[in-house]
């Protein structure tokens, strides 16, 4: 959902097309993301719960695709949103009102390092052997008042 807001999914201006012999490498890509130089996410595409072929097969049964369509999937661990046992206990408590749950959730999330204006996000995707290297994508978070 969050990737669908305007400006929330920077992509391009280039599209990397794999050579046929490089297609197997999509199952061994290192995915790294830093915020202000601090590594926040580090994973490998081999850890995906649903592989690209499975995802494309399932989605193509539900919708049509056109050349250039961008398919967004999940994310690697390390995002700011965190739910611990206490959070789950609060959210699943049927005695607590919906409004109180939201208030408690928001309050407990304040300690997490969400993005702020001025933060610099840098990400890289490349195969372990270096055959595929998508370069570096760097963006500065701008706060709009």
Predicted regions and their residues:
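Glycine-enriched loop-and-adjacent helix/strand subsegments that border the catalytic/binding cleft
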Residues: 1-58, 62, 94-105, 110-119, ...
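Low-complexity, intrinsically disordered Gly/Pro/Thr-rich segments
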Residues: 118-128
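Residue-level signal for inorganic ion chemistry
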Residues: 11, 68, 125
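Glycine-rich, small/acidic residue-mixed loop/short-helix segments
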Residues: 87, 91-92
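Beta-rich strand-turn-strand
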Residues: 62-72
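Short, Lys/Arg- and Gly-enriched loop/turn segments at beta-strand edges
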Residues: 79-86, 105-108, 128-139
């Amino acid at each position: 959902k969050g990737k669908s807001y305007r400006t929330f999914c920077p992509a391009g201006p280039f599209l990397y097309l794999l050579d046929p012999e490089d297609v197997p490498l999509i199952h061994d890509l290192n995915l790294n993301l830093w915020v202000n130089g601090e590594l926040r996410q580090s994973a490998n595409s081999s850890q995906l719960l649903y592989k690209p072929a499975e995802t494309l097969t399932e989605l193509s049964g539900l919708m049509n695709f056109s050349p250039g369509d961008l398919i967004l999937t999940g994310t690697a661990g390390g995002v700011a949103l965190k739910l611990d046992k206490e959070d789950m206990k609060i959210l699943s408590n049927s005695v607590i009102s919906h409004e109180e749950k939201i208030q408690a959730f928001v309050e407990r999330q304040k300690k997490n390092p969400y993005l702020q204006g001025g933060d610099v996000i840098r990400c890289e995707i490349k195969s372990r052997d270096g055959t595929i290297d998508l370069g570096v994508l760097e963006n500065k978070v701008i706060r709009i008042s």
